[in-house]
């Protein structure tokens, strides 16, 4: 009995241990089963009910869930577009930790979420985004009774690694993406309004990188941004620009180290500091043809705060800006690109569709609208090496002028200063300079002093206009103009001095494109005895309604009418001496002229005879070729010739002197000729007759004819010297291409050794005339013009 009593406690203890072991085993097995089964079960439930839960189809690779630690891992996660087989977002690996203990406090918290090899797309169609359905599904429905939320949600420490994110817009259209995206977000707690994001990524299609931080208070919409960009390609803007133009290409990249803070509710409530630069900006007909461009536009900002009326810059500069304006028969290059008066741009901005370019433009306008009424300061404002071109194709000949290099400089543009000084200087191609000095009151734009100087402009530059409107070109002349303006309270007091030194008309051009004015009579009235047009034209009155005082012009015209007949012998003497010198030193070639005329033959013969008599003497001949004009003339002639032969059913062998004269007099605006060009040149982006002719007649053919023309002129010139046996005393030097002083190609002749007596006599006579009235007054100007 004692033994039985002794074993009963032991059996009871054994049973307890056994029960505990069984329970522990069951629990352990259950835990193992839960760990083993919860992952596939969760995957099955999610994929089975994905559309019911989210409205989206979801697929996953492997799923690992630890319900005890809250760890979740999903591989090859893919969430598809709404009712589509296209992927919305995907991740090679998605990892998350849930704070399991906080579930006891009715708080669902994802303590960290990491998405590796992330891929996503934001798609916009009109005003609808591809994630709007998700927002609508998870947005609580409004009820009459407002009950406090019983379950709170936190999501913290979000990371995206090695991401690719696309932005697509069907209406524009646009398809842009960024790559190597690394995004870190502190996340959002249910009882916190702050959101902090750190980001970095590369431009997808092209070069460039961007990184920075973004912080925001989601309740009051205050924000803080830091952006560092390095050569970040701005291709994303190209589709929006494409919507604002008829044709053309665009490119640029961004350099920035910028900080900003403000509030999203008020565009003016923002403060910028740092540096912003746009590099290698190009806009043009194609990648090789610019309409507008610049190497670099840089803003260095101390403080820009429109709300506090502060615009403080260390420097604002633009390097190598370029702009080309072209005028056509009925429009210009800007009208062709952007519509009449920018209608293409305005139509796009008022269509109701989002356009990033117009949005940025409107934002900049909002930021800068109170600039001149605010406290502003720019320590240095500069334009370096600018280049501005103007081409006019509406005339019978192309007019072209270029202002380069343009340099504008101003130090300390400050509203607190009494005056702000701005200096402008540039060369004018083919010849000349322009200088402007402006001193302005920063508090009053109607209070300024202006001095300008326009010097050494060849009058022959304007021959296309003179031929078109008068039929008379000039073959010499220098234009200069100076002025001093003083403006106080919007009232002008200015002196302007115009000089045209030695202007001289050439023979009349006869073709159907030109109008006719009695230019010899007009020049006789305008030009004084010193062979100079010299007028002082004061301007007074209000800036918006100035008065031009033409007393000097009228007085000189009346004097010339009375005096000119009496002084005709003097003027003829001057003209004859100038002609003797000019003909001794130059040989002018008309457009497409191959053989010297009779007078030129006589001149060449005299030179050859002079060299024959003076074996120690020699001449050097330097061709000055008006290459652009010669090429344009040949292109137009050959195109008109091709049209003429087709119109009259003739071949090349039937084209003689009569046909040549008819083609030369034919207008390049001739209706039938224009129809012929348009029939053969199908492109709607070729706007000028010159460009159409260049496509009709291959450039290689034109260059061959130019080379042949140059060689024929040289051979014809040397023919007389060869006959006289003095060809070794004649040397040709390298040709100069450009716009010659007389508006024509010519040979410049330099004598070495002995000078011809007639030339010496002409020089002496001209020096004598230049040292006496009325030419003495302009002696210095003539010397400067020659230089």
Where are the regions that the model predicts?
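Bacterial Sec-dependent N-terminal signal peptides
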Residues: 1-53, 785
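Secondary-structure transition motifs
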Residues: 7, 76-185, 267, 283-405, ...
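Extended terminal
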Residues: 7-23, 304-309, 314, 369-376, ...
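Terminal hydrophobic membrane-targeting helix
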Residues: 30-126, 155, 183, 188-192, ...
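Buried hydrophobic packing residues in well-ordered domains
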Residues: 50, 74, 94, 113, ...
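Soluble periplasmic/extracytoplasmic beta-strand elements of cell-envelope proteins
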Residues: 73-76, 90-95, 112-114, 159, ...
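Interface amphipathic segments
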Residues: 103-108, 174-251, 290-292, 306-363, ...
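Solvent-exposed beta-strand/coil patches in large extracellular/periplasmic or lumenal scaffold regions
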Residues: 137-171, 194-202, 263, 340-497, ...
């Amino acid at each position: 009995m004692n033994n039985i009593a002794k074993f009963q406690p032991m059996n009871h203890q054994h049973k307890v241990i056994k029960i505990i072991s069984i329970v522990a085993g069951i629990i352990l097995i259950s835990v193992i089963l839960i760990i083993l089964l919860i992952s596939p079960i969760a995957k099955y439930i999610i994929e089975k009910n994905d559309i019911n839960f989210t409205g989206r189809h979801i697929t996953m690779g492997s799923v690992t869930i630890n319900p005890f630690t809250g760890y979740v891992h999903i591989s090859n996660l893919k969430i598809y577009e709404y009712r589509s087989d296209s992927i919305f977002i995907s991740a090679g690996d998605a990892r998350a930790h849930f704070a399991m203990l906080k579930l006891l406090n009715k708080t669902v918290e994802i303590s960290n979420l990491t998405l590796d090899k992330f891929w996503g797309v934001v798609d916009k169609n009109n005003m609808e985004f591809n994630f709007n359905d998700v927002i609508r599904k998870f947005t609580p429905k409004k009820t009459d009774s407002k009950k406090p939320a019983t379950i709170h949600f936190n999501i913290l420490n979000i990371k995206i690694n090695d991401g690719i994110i696309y932005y697509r817009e069907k209406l524009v259209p646009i398809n842009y993406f960024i790559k190597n995206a690394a995004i870190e977000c502190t996340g959002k707690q249910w009882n916190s309004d702050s959101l902090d994001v750190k980001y970095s990524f590369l431009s997808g299609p092209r070069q460039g990188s961007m990184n920075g931080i973004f912080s925001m208070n989601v309740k009051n919409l205050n924000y803080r941004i830091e952006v560092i960009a390095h050569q970040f390609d701005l291709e994303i803007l190209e589709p929006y620009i494409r919507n604002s133009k008829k044709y053309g290409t665009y490119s640029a990249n961004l350099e920035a180290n910028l900080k900003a803070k403000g509030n999203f509710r008020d565009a003016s409530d923002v403060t910028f500091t740092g540096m912003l630069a746009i590099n290698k900006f190009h806009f043009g007909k194609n990648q090789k043809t610019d309409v507008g461009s610049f190497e670099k536009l840089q803003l260095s900002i101390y403080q820009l705060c429109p709300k506090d009326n502060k615009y403080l810059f260390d420097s604002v500069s633009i390097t190598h800006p370029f702009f080309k304006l072209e005028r056509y028969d009925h429009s210009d290059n800007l009208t062709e690109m952007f519509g009449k008066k920018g209608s293409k741009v305005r139509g796009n901005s008022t269509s109701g569709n989002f356009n990033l370019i117009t949005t940025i433009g409107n934002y900049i306008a909002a930021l800068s609208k109170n600039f001149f009424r605010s406290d502003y300061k720019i320590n240095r404002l500069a334009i370096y090496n600018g280049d501005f071109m103007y081409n006019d194709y509406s005339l019978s000949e192309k007019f072209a002028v270029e202002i380069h290099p343009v340099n504008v400089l101003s130090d300390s543009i400050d509203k607190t200063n009494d005056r702000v000084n701005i200096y402008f200087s540039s060369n004018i191609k083919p010849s000349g300079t322009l200088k402007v000095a402006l001193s302005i009151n920063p508090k009053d734009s109607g209070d300024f002093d202006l001095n300008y100087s326009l010097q050494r402009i060849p009058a022959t530059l304007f021959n296309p206009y003179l031929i078109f409107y008068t039929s008379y070109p000039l073959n010499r002349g220098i234009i200069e103009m100076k002025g001093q303006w003083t403006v106080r309270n919007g009232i002008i007091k200015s002196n302007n001095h115009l000089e045209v030194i030695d202007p001289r008309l050439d023979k009349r051009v006869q073709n159907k494109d030109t109008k006719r004015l009695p230019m010899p009579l007009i020049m006789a009235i305008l030009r004084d005895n010193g062979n100079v047009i010299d007028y002082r034209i004061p301007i007074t009155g209000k800036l918006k309604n100035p008065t031009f005082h033409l007393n000097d012009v009228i007085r000189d015209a009346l004097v010339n009418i009375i005096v000119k007949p009496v002084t005709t012998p003097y003027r003829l003497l001057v003209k004859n001496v100038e002609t003797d010198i000019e003909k001794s030193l130059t040989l002018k070639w008309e457009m497409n002229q191959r053989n010297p005329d009779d007078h030129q033959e006589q001149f060449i013969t005299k030179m050859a005879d002079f060299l024959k008599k003076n074996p120690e003497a020699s001449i050097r001949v330097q061709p000055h070729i008006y290459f652009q004009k010669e090429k344009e003339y040949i292109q137009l002639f050959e195109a008109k010739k091709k049209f003429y032969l087709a119109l009259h059913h003739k071949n090349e062998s039937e084209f003689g002197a009569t046909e040549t004269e008819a083609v030369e007099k034919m207008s390049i605006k001739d209706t039938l000729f224009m129809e012929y060009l348009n029939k053969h040149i199908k492109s709607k982006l070729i706007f000028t007759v010159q460009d159409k002719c260049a496509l009709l007649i291959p450039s290689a053919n034109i260059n061959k004819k130019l080379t042949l023309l140059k060689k024929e002129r040289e051979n014809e010139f040397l023919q007389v010297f060869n006959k006289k046996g003095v060809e070794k005393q004649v040397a040709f030097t390298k040709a100069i291409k450009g716009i010659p002083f007389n508006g024509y190609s010519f040979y410049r002749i330099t004598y070495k050794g002995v000078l011809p007596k007639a030339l010496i006599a002409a020089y002496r006579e001209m020096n004598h005339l230049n040292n006496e009235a009325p030419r003495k007054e302009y002696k210095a100007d003539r010397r400067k013009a020659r230089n």
